[in-house]
């Protein structure tokens, strides 16, 4: 295996996936930057790329060092209807920041759009497509490597997004924020995948809203849907960094802990290594994270799949595999934890004796 810090030549996303390579994604910016004081919860808009570019640059850098092969532009909800006159400057600045950091590590830059707030109230295809098209024009001008339509809870709107993104000829990925029950109009995950593939998406999957194991259940259903329809597409998954087995159809946003009380649900790095391995075994080759993921979670994906990738990320220079760095500790009971079996089988306590293990969703 190559030493930590080795990088691959910059190949396109489809060239990598077509050859069977593992692509490690990055993570959601909103929750991490909200905790750091640069994003306002509720609005969840990315003015930070203009107001605090150093904070965004730093997080891109941390994800790259952790092993990310793709840096997404921080353009979630950066639409004209959400940001008025600021939308264009925000999208342009987001592209510049991602490209600046990616250039130092051979990573790809993906321009990202997401569902609109308009769709729930006015299913105006022309107007919604024009909203997407405005962002796309900036991404095309900035020459991003590929495009991602993410966080869609209605497949109809996701299809519209794919149709718009295909207009510039760049590879298109699309991820829905759905669980095994399907989208908000009761379209099953398998049917969603088929519709997206027929719309022309090159890469199909899920992101956000649900934790690792629920997301992988949904991906299995998407994969089966594509197989049954004799359609092919690359698969991707970017789940939450929280455990959410008690979610309803709407995902973690319906849990009473959302968004400020989710810390007891945070996945460990070892949970994420298991997630990465299960995703790989399912045939998924684009594996990343979303809200709740931190750079060390991305490092966990990169480390788990290092045998397949052929190298470790730079951040592994400061991390012993499966706790191996603990073998030099002065306390023998801590030295005894320097092994995979210990961490794989640990059931972490929350330290909250009067708190329930699960919650009841509010919706």
UniProtKB/Swiss-Prot annotation:
GO terms assigned for molecular function: S-adenosylmethionine-homocysteine S-methyltransferase activity; S-methylmethionine-homocysteine S-methyltransferase activity; zinc ion binding
Reaction(s) catalysed by this chain's protein: S-methyl-L-methionine + L-homocysteine = 2 L-methionine + H(+)
Pathway: Amino-acid biosynthesis; L-methionine biosynthesis via de novo pathway; L-methionine from L-homocysteine (BhmT route): step 1/1
Residue numbers carrying Phosphoserine: 321
Known EC number: 2.1.1.10
InterPro entries (UniProt xref): Betaine-hCys_S-MeTrfase_BHMT, BHMT, HCY_dom, HCY_dom_sf
Example GO biological process: S-adenosylmethionine metabolic process
Keyword tags: Metal-binding, Methyltransferase, Phosphoprotein, Transferase, Zinc
Entry keyword GTP-binding: no
The species this protein was found in: Mus musculus
Positions bound to Zn(2+): 208, 290-291
Transmembrane stretches, start-end: none
Protein name: S-methylmethionine--homocysteine S-methyltransferase BHMT2
Keyword Nuclease: no
Highest taxon in the source lineage: Eukaryota
Cofactor note: Binds 1 zinc ion per subunit.
């Amino acid at each position: 295996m190559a030493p930590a810090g080795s990088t691959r030549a910059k190949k396109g996303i489809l060239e990598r996936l077509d050859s069977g390579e593992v692509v490690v994604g990055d993570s959601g910016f909103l929750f991490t930057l909200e905790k750091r004081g640069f994003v306002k919860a509720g609005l969840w808009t990315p003015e930070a790329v203009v107001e605090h570019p150093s904070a965004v640059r730093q997080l891109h850098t941390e994800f790259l060092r952790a092993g990310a092969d793709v840096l997404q532009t921080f353009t979630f909800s950066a639409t004209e209807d959400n940001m008025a006159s600021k939308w264009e400057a925000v999208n342009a600045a987001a592209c510049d920041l991602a490209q600046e950091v990616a250039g130092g590590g051979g990573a790809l830059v993906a321009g990202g759009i997401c569902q609109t707030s308009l769709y729930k109230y006015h299913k105006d295809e022309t107007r919604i497509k024009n909203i997407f098209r405005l962002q796309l024009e900036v991404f095309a001008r900035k020459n991003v490597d590929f495009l991602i339509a993410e966080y869609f809870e209605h497949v109809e709107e996701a299809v519209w997004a794919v149709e718009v993104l295909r207009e510039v000829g760049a590879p298109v990925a699309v991820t829905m924020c759905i669980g095994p029950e399907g989208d908000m109009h009761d379209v099953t995950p398998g049917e969603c995948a088929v519709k997206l593939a027929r719309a022309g998406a090159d890469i199909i999957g899920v992101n956000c809203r649900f934790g690792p194991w629920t997301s992988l259940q949904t991906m299995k259903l998407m994969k089966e849907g594509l197989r049954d329809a004799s359609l092919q597409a690359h698969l991707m998954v970017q789940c939450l960094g929280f455990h959410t087995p008690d979610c309803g159809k709407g995902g973690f946003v319906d849990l009473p802990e959302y968004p400020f009380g989710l810390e007891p649900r945070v996945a460990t790095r070892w949970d994420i290594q298991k997630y990465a391995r299960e995703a790989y075994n399912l045939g998924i080759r684009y594996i990343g994270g979303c809200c709740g993921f931190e750079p060390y979670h991305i490092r966990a994906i990169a480390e788990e799949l290092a045998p397949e990738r052929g190298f470790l990320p730079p951040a592994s220079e400061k991390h012993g595999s499966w706790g191996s760095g603990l073998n030099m500790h002065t306390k023998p009971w801590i030295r005894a934890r320097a092994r995979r079996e210990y961490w794989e089988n640990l059931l972490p306590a929350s330290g909250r004796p009067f708190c329930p293990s699960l919650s009841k969703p509010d919706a």
